[in-house]
Amino acid sequence: AVNVNTNVSAMTAQRYLNQA
């Protein structure tokens, strides 16, 4: 569960940086 949460968090951060 923790691993999945970390993966989603990193994915969200990457999308945010890509959008900016």
Swiss-Prot record:
GO terms for cellular component: bacterial-type flagellum; extracellular region. It is found in: Secreted; Bacterial flagellum. Keywords: Bacterial flagellum, Secreted. Its main location: secreted. Belongs to the bacterial flagellin family. Flagellin is the subunit protein which polymerizes to form the filaments of bacterial flagella. This is Flagellin. It comes from Vibrio alginolyticus.
